Structures are given as C-alpha cells and as structure tokens.
C-alpha cells in the first residue's frame, strides 16, 4: 500500500485530546496507593468505534462488558479505565462489578449505558474494590487540557516506566484531521491481541464497520508483532473512537484519501507498539527485526516474531554479544519453508552471515554498535519480494526480579 506520507505530519505536542471533541482525566483513588489509577476519555458526541481484543481464552470481565457495549451500536462516548486491579478471574461478581462500572460512567457523564467502555489492568484474581471505584468515577471531570491527557496516560500504567503517547495530523478532503493514541504495556506482552491497552482518538469521519476493518488489518502488522516475554494476557485491547467532527466526507475504501487515513492509523499503532516493546519490564534495549525477501508477508512476520521472541536472542542482545547463531537457529524453528543456503543476516547494519556463510567483522565496531539503545536485525531470505517486521526488547536480570515480586 502506498501511503501519502506528505499528507501525514507528526504532532510532537499532540495528545488524545488534540482531535476535536475529546477530553480526558486521570486521578488518584487508592488502587495504587499514591499513584494515578483511574481515568476516562470522553467524547462530546457518540463516536464511531472499533476494537480488537486479547485472544486468551480467559477473558477479563471489563473486556466482556466493552464487547457488549461496542456490539450494541458500534458507538462509544466514554472509556473508563482503572489500573492496579485487572478484575480478571473474579467470577460472576467481577462481571457484575464491570457492568456497574459501566452504569456509573453512564450516569455520571449523562449518556447511554452502551456508549461506555470499561477497561482494567493489574493483578489478576483480586476482587475490584467497588467502594473506591464508585467514589472515583463520581469525581471524574475530564477537560481538554493537555495536562489531563497526560494524567490519563499515567492512570493506566502498571509496571510501565514511561507513559506512551503519539499524535499525527493528516489532510483529508483538504481539511486537517488529527489522530492520537495512548498505550500501556510492559510485561506479559505477546499480543494476538494481548497484554496491553491502547486507546486511540480521531476526529475523522468514518463509520464503525470501515474503522473496524482498518484497525483489524493494522493490528496484525503492529501490536501483534511485538513480544516482551511470550505471555498473553486476559484483559487487553485496543479501542479507536472517531468523533467525525473534522467534517470531511465519510472516509471509506473508495475515498481518495483512504490510504492517508490508514497510513496515519498505522503510524499511531506502530509508534505505540514500539514504545511498549522498548518499555518491556527490565528492558535496556529495543530490538527490531526485519525479514526481507520472503514468499509471503505472513511468513516474513512469523520469522521476525520468532527471532524477537527468542529468549536466547534477547539475552545475547542484553549481553551485547553478536551471537548470530541464535538468530539463524530461530529462523529454522519458525516452521516457515526456507532455503538454508541463501540466508543473509546483518546486525546493526554489519554483515554477519552471507549466503549462510559466516562473515568476518570488526569485533570492536560491533561491540560499539551493540551498546546502542536500539538494535536492528535484518534477515534476507532471497525467496520472494515480501517483508515483515517485529519488535521486542532484551531480557535482563531485572525482568526476573520485577516478576518474582509483582504481587508484593
């Protein structure tokens, strides 16, 4: 797909409240002691929406309730999110609590119940403290201030070290249209869809079914191509809300600027996916794997994700060890048909394998390059024209420490 890059501009100071019609809030309520733990995004009008969800067969109560909301009309006007408690594996009481959270939001913001989505993230198997939720929702007063957009970003974090935001402006029908996103995710990241939350706002004029098609396709190339530890969560999802307040013609696949919109949505999703991978628990380096010359895009993506998900590759990168043997071993494990005699591998643009034969390289130069924060592995299969990418992070001693002590 050709993306009209000239029509898409990154807004460095933009946020989820930059698109027309959106406001946000994040507050401290006691779910995470003194940290922000409850937030909301609210739209001035019922917004077209789309969502993708975890493929884990154990699905948390908030996710079930949000599915119910979106299925009703394909519209949302508010998203309420808490952190510190996942409300997962909490039985019928957990489901009732999630529905009550939705009712509380509808009553507080004055909107239809099925226009409210709910999300939770945190420890699994602990009942949601509804006394805190009831009091907290009643105090949520969203604003269009950028500072409150940042507060929302903080309110959805768990073991994350940083907030994750991005924003782009595009030109549709000659008018400025904005799309922005926020995400959380640090551990249990192996989406398909899983282990992270992302909320995207836009003032684009686009209907639910068209937006759903775009999001589902883009998710497969972005969020589903990141891995931190190979675990798939019970809670997580991506939701897009489109207010339509940019007042362009309805965007669909026949629209002359369709590729521009899809390109901007992909940039938002890819930015957030990379930020999640880079902020993996205990991570010190972002790893990007690009597979080129594959027979199909799906095969390229499968190999890329196999490599970036390998614990041996991740630990080698953490130790700044150019052990390309672990990379080619991962390629062979991918169950994708390859020619074992035509593989090239570069590590930080330095050739380590050519036609499946080892290459001589400067150890000093390689050591210097592997000390960088972002590591790029390129694999050339020489089988076709298709490419695919995946993102992850190194595996450190700190990851074990964080997860050994998570509940405490």
From Swiss-Prot:
Record SUPFAM superfamilies: DmpA/ArgJ-like
Role noted for this protein: Catalyzes two activities which are involved in the cyclic version of arginine biosynthesis: the synthesis of N-acetylglutamate from glutamate and acetyl-CoA as the acetyl donor, and of ornithine by transacetylation between N(2)-acetylornithine and glutamate.
Protein localization: Cytoplasm
Name of the molecule in the record: Arginine biosynthesis bifunctional protein ArgJ
Pfam families assigned to the protein according to its UniProt record, in alphabetical order: ArgJ (PF01960)
Superkingdom of source: Bacteria
UniProt-annotated catalytic positions: 195 (nucleophile)
Organism (species): Bacillus cereus (strain ATCC 14579 / DSM 31 / CCUG 7414 / JCM 2152 / NBRC 15305 / NCIMB 9373 / NCTC 2599 / NRRL B-3711)
Record's GO cellular component terms: cytoplasm
Designated gene of the protein: argJ
Site (Cleavage): 194-195
Residues carrying the site annotation Involved in the stabilization of negative charge on the oxyanion by the formation of the oxyanion hole: 121-122
Residues reported in the UniProt entry to bind substrate: 158, 184, 195, 281, 403, 408
Phylogenetic placement of the source organism: Bacteria, Bacillati, Bacillota, Bacilli, Bacillales
EC number of this enzyme: 2.3.1.35, 2.3.1.1
Family label: Belongs to the ArgJ family.
InterPro entries in UniProt: Arg_biosynth_ArgJ (IPR002813), ArgJ-like_dom_sf (IPR016117), ArgJ_beta_C (IPR042195)
Pathway(s) it belongs to: Amino-acid biosynthesis; L-arginine biosynthesis; L-ornithine and N-acetyl-L-glutamate from L-glutamate and N(2)-acetyl-L-ornithine (cyclic): step 1/1; Amino-acid biosynthesis; L-arginine biosynthesis; N(2)-acetyl-L-ornithine from L-glutamate: step 1/4
Catalyzed reactions per annotation: N(2)-acetyl-L-ornithine + L-glutamate = N-acetyl-L-glutamate + L-ornithine; L-glutamate + acetyl-CoA = N-acetyl-L-glutamate + CoA + H(+)
GO biological process: L-arginine biosynthetic process; ornithine biosynthetic process
GO MF term (any one): L-glutamate N-acetyltransferase activity
Subunit structure: Heterotetramer of two alpha and two beta chains.
Keyword field: Acyltransferase, Amino-acid biosynthesis, Arginine biosynthesis, Autocatalytic cleavage, Cytoplasm, Multifunctional enzyme, Transferase
